[in-house]
């Protein structure tokens, strides 16, 4: 029961944080609206959500740059918004 409560709290924190705007369940990018991609959940690759494309300074995945992507996206991060590139910044990749 304690583990369940911790998971619920964690999900609530993530859902209300700036970096995890969840807009709806999906299977592929074409099911999401403009400016979003169908990203895999950080907890389970079988669960995907429509997530906004990355803004300047936000974390990104360098191999995940095509929208819409034809297959099932494996990354939990969306590509950067149009006009931005995903480049290495320190130990992470960020949209710039």
Curated annotation (Swiss-Prot):
Q: Where is the signal peptide?
A: 1-19
> Which cysteines does the record link by disulfide bonds?
26-38, 32-50, 37-78, 60-86, 80-95
Q: Where in the cell is it found?
A: Secreted
> How would you summarize where this protein is expressed among tissues?
Expressed by the skin glands.
- The superkingdom of the source organism is Eukaryota
GO biological process: what's one of them?
A: endothelial cell proliferation
- Keyword annotations: Disulfide bond, G-protein coupled receptor impairing toxin, Secreted, Signal, Toxin
The keyword Acetylation is assigned to this record: no
Q: Which Gene3D superfamilies match?
A: Lipase, subunit A
The keyword Transferase belongs to this UniProt entry's keyword annotation = no
Question: Which Pfam families is this protein grouped with?
Answer: Prokineticin
Query: Molecular function terms in GO for this entry?
Result: toxin activity
Q: List the GO terms this entry assigns under cellular component, sorted alphabetically.
A: extracellular region
Q: What's its job?
A: Potent agonist for both PKR1/PROKR1 and PKR2/PROKR2, and inducer of a potent and long-lasting hyperalgesia. Also potentiates capsaicin-induced TRPV1 current, when tested on DRG neurons. At subnanomolar concentrations, this protein both induces potent chemotaxis of macrophages and stimulates LPS-induced production of the pro-inflammatory cytokines IL-1 and IL-12. In vivo, potently stimulates the contraction of the guinea-pig gastrointestinal (GI) smooth muscle (nanomolar concentration).
Q: Which PANTHER family match?
A: PROKINETICIN, PROKINETICIN-1
Q: Which family does it belong to?
A: Belongs to the AVIT (prokineticin) family.
Record's protein name: Prokineticin Bo8
| Source species | Bombina orientalis (Oriental fire-bellied toad)
